Curated annotation (Swiss-Prot):
The active site is at S738, K781. Residues 4-224 form the Lon N-terminal domain. This is Lon protease. Induction: By heat shock.
Length: 835
């Protein structure tokens, strides 16, 4: 046979001796169509891609199916950049080879082909009998259409045309098989709507016409059976379908419909699995199975494509995927816990000690209460069914013991290891870890879920977290619990109180799930930055564990043992290419960071690593690189902070104060100046001071005025002088009473024109009688003072007991002076200086 252009198609079946429309858009196919029209009288081959491959992936002959068809272009309809091409399809052909060139025509890809003729075999008498049988079946199928109007395969028009073709073609020559071949393909073309690729290619690849005719006749018989079956279904199944073949066909039809609708009967299978499980190892509580049956019955009555059906399927999926009684095994080994905590965290001795106590109680109560019957889950390693979960008695969940182990809340500045500490607890126990971020959560539904009546409803964060964990005893971290707030949508904290109360969380009810869930096996750990923003009701339900600011030695040790190994790994550096001493690490910490944790320190060390990598690629570094202070200044720029503090001459009215914030300890300066004014006793406050701090400044001024003679400023004209108090860094809001003694000292210094040494700082609340009241965060304030070179700190007498928490390295460099009344500070600074 002659060589012609060809196009390759996928996802479309084209029968020989039929009319077919193909949408053309790819450059190769458009070129083939053009060549066929201009040089080959509209003749073209149509081939199928093998295994339904993309047309663009055709590179060789073996990428095509063995058989295709010859066709002639009948009509082309332009549709934008696409062409709808109508083909008059002729005989079946066998692909031989594909080319890029054909005579004077050529293209960048293979768009020309050569083929061989397909030779058929078959007994003329048998084929004649088959044809007579097919003609009779076609007439029967046509009559069935006339009687019931049933939609069968090709429809009324296709069957009528088929009947007409068989009636007209009466004279068949015994010398050729062409007429039988045409008849077979007309049947297939008429019934092409529902028959599969497998059947189609089975006929294409078979050259024995007798076998092909058998397949075609079977298709006709099935079409008649399906037509009669449709009649019975449409008449509400008036008769019982006792015939086994009818029953099979009906089920097959239902299966195909569900397959098209993608309805996989997941809910029904889930119920089957639940009920087939052994009684002593059943994962699902009885009331869950009943709820699932009810929901499955509702789903069965819905239209499969309706929105309600999709909502119901999602709900069923949630119920079947929640772990319910499934738990993971625990590694209750104190030595292992201690090893893991020390591996991931340096220092933090008090938090580690409390966590060991916490896990010790879990271990001991577990041994004392071995009544818990754990049944292994088949096919899942380290997964068990806890029979004591969801025990339903008289409508309430009761357990043999109450889980009275308190819920830990880790309090500390950012970067001090709260989240990693929670992960270490999960690792030590061998439990799954789930983190739930609560920062900015304002809606109660985020915790308790949305009711399913709302569009886009979802379960709350707690149930979603348990689903993600896949077990009912994970470690759940409630991160930034102090950052939640409430608005008109409800109070998420109130919903969280139920979760965190061991007396109530055995029957926690999510609005979306609408079924009680036992949270008693969940180990909740919360984190927060400060106590101030934690609501009062939460204090009764959790135990606070404070993670304080790291010292210089601790930061250096953490950098050496944890940060550097991670940074070297991330940047593919060796220890010789990143040589840094503890002295240089301390230099970076003192002069480039002001933080409680080590996050910024890690960023700086990582920045140095990246610059070393650049030098290696520029061939400026070979096998070794030593980082000294000069290299640090070159890589990180000038020093950001002065570790020796303010070395300028002390000035009257300027005093160092110490503060404790959610981000750790910090130092600040109080400035006071005076100037004449017509306003009597005016006091100006600037620097974004909030109410408590403004009141503290007012109290300090009142105390100074009432004791002016004692402080040596009795001749000062308060009535005609304005006193201005400023706290630098005015963009940052400041509050708290602990700057009272600092305000007092700064006012006395400004009015008496006597400067206070830069190496002195103080903290403490003051009363109108001059009593110095205790403050919080002494350790953090002391660490902040040590970073700026402070040598003496005045603290309240009542805080003397807290000096035990201050690291020895800080106490070695700083003198702490406990005072009960302000007079003691005045005498130390002003009178001692005069002497």
């Amino acid at each position: 046979m002659k060589k012609l252009p060809y196009i390759a198609i996928r996802n479309q079946l084209i029968a020989p001796y039929s009319t077919a429309t193909v949408k053309i858009g790819r450059p190769n196919s458009l070129a083939a169509i053009q060549f066929a029209q201009t040089g080959f009288n509209g003749e073209i081959y149509i081939f199928y891609t093998k295994d339904n491959k993309m047309v663009d992936s055709i590179k060789k002959t073996s990428d095509l199916e063995e058989y295709g068809v010859k066709a002639k272009i009948k009509e082309i309809v332009e549709q934008g950049k696409l062409q709808n091409v109508v083909f008059e399809v002729e005989e079946l052909v066998k692909v031989k080879e594909i080319y890029k060139e054909l005579g004077k025509y050529s293209f960048t890809s293979d768009i020309f082909a050569s083929v061989t003729e397909v030779e058929y075999s078959g007994n003329f008498d048998i084929l004649s009998d088959y044809r007579s049988k097919a003609k009779m079946l076609i007439e029967k199928l046509s009559n069935l259409h006339d009687e019931i109007g049933s939609y069968i395969y090709g429809g009324r028009r296709g069957i009528k045309e088929l009947e007409k073709a068989f009636s007209a073609n009466t004279n068949i020559s015994p010398l050729t098989h062409d007429s039988f071949n045409v008849d077979i393909w007309k049947i297939i073309d008429a019934l092409t709507i529902e028959h599969s690729w497998k059947e189609y290619f089975a006929i294409i690849n078979e050259t024995n016409l007798e076998k092909n005719y058998e397949l075609a006749i079977n298709m006709l018989i099935n079409a008649i059976k399906m037509g009669k079956l449709d009649e019975e279904v449409n008449s509400t199944m008036r008769g019982d379908l006792e015939n086994q073949q009818r029953d099979f066909l009906l089920r097959e039809r239902l299966r195909q419909i569900k397959k098209l609708l993608k309805d996989d009967e997941a809910g029904a299978k889930a119920i089957e699995n639940m009920e087939d499980a052994e009684e002593n190892a059943r994962q699902y509580p009885d009331y869950v199975i009943e709820a699932l049956k009810t929901e499955q019955n509702r789903l069965a009555s819905m239209m499969p494509a309706s929105p309600e059906a999709n909502i119901s399927k999602t709900y069923i999926d949630l119920i079947t995927t929640l772990p319910w009684k499934k738990v993971s095994g625990e590694l209750l080994d104190i030595d292992n816990v201690r090893k893991i905590l020390d591996k991931h965290h340096y220092g933090l001795e008090k938090p580690k000690e409390r966590i060991l106590e916490f896990i010790s109680v879990l271990t001991y109560t577990k041994k004392e209460n071995e009544k818990n019957e754990y049944v292994p889950v088949k096919g899942e390693e380290n997964r068990f069914i806890d029979k004591n979960l969801f025990v339903n008695k008289t409508g309430n969940f009761l357990k043999d013991r109450v889980n009275n182990i308190p819920i830990l809340t880790l309090i500390g500045p950012p970067g001090t290891g709260k989240t990693t500490l929670a992960k270490s607890i999960a690792e030590a126990l061998g439990r799954q870890f789930v983190k739930i971020s609560l920062g900015g959560v304002k809606d109660e539904s985020e915790i308790r879920g949305h009711r399913r009546t709302y569009v886009g409803a979802l379960p709350g964060k707690i149930i979603s977290g348990i689903k993600k964990a896949g077990v009912s005893n994970p470690v759940i971290l409630l991160d930034e619990i102090d950052k939640m707030s409430s608005d008109f949508r409800g109070d998420p904290l109130s919903a969280l109180l139920e979760v965190l109360d061991p007396e109530q969380n055995t029957n926690f009810q999510d609005h979306y799930l609408d079924l009680e869930y036992d949270l008693s096996k969940v180990l909740f750990i919360a984190t927060a930055n400060s106590f101030d923003s934690i609501p009062a009701p939460l204090y009764d339900r959790v135990e606070f564990l404070e993670l304080s600011t790291y010292t210089l030695i601790e930061k250096t040790r953490i950098a050496r043992t944890h940060l550097l190994s991670k940074i070297l790994s991330l940047n593919a550096l060796t220890e010789k290419q990143y040589q840094i001493t503890d002295e240089v690490l301390a230099y970076i910490i003192k002069n480039y960071t002001r933080e409680s944790g080590v996050r910024n320190l890690q960023r700086l060390l990582d920045s140095i690593a990246r610059k070393i990598v650049v030098r290696i690629l520029d061939k400026k570094v070979d096998k070794e690189f030593v980082i000294d202070k000069a290299i640090v200044r070159e890589f990180l720029g000038p020093e950001l902070y002065n570790e020796k503090g303010d070395e300028t001459q002390p000035k009257a009215g300027v005093v160092n104060a110490l503060a404790y914030t959610a981000y750790g300890g910090t130092s600040m300066t109080i400035e006071v100046t005076t100037f004449p004014t017509t306003a009597k006793g005016a006091l100006n406050l600037t620097g974004q001071l909030k109410d408590v701090m403004r009141e503290s400044a007012t109290i300090s001024l009142a105390y100074v005025r009432s004791n002016a003679e004692k402080f040596g400023i009795k001749d000062f004209d308060f009535e005609n002088t304005s006193i201005h108090i400023h706290v630098p860094e005015g963009a940052i809001q400041k509050d708290g009473p602990s700057a009272g003694v600092t305000f007092t000292t700064a006012i006395i210094s400004a009015l008496s024109k006597k400067a206070v040494p830069n190496t002195i700082a103080m903290t403490g609340e003051i009363t109108l009688r001059g009593k110095v009241l205790p403050i919080g965060g002494l350790k953090e304030k002391s660490l902040a003072a040590s970073q700026i070179g402070i040598k003496t700190i005045f603290i309240p007498k009542d805080n003397e007991k807290n000096l035990i928490d201050v690291p020895e390295e800080v106490k070695k460099d700083i003198k702490f002076v406990p005072v009960e009344y302000y007079d003691e500070i005045f005498k130390y600074i002003f009178e001692a200086k005069n002497k």
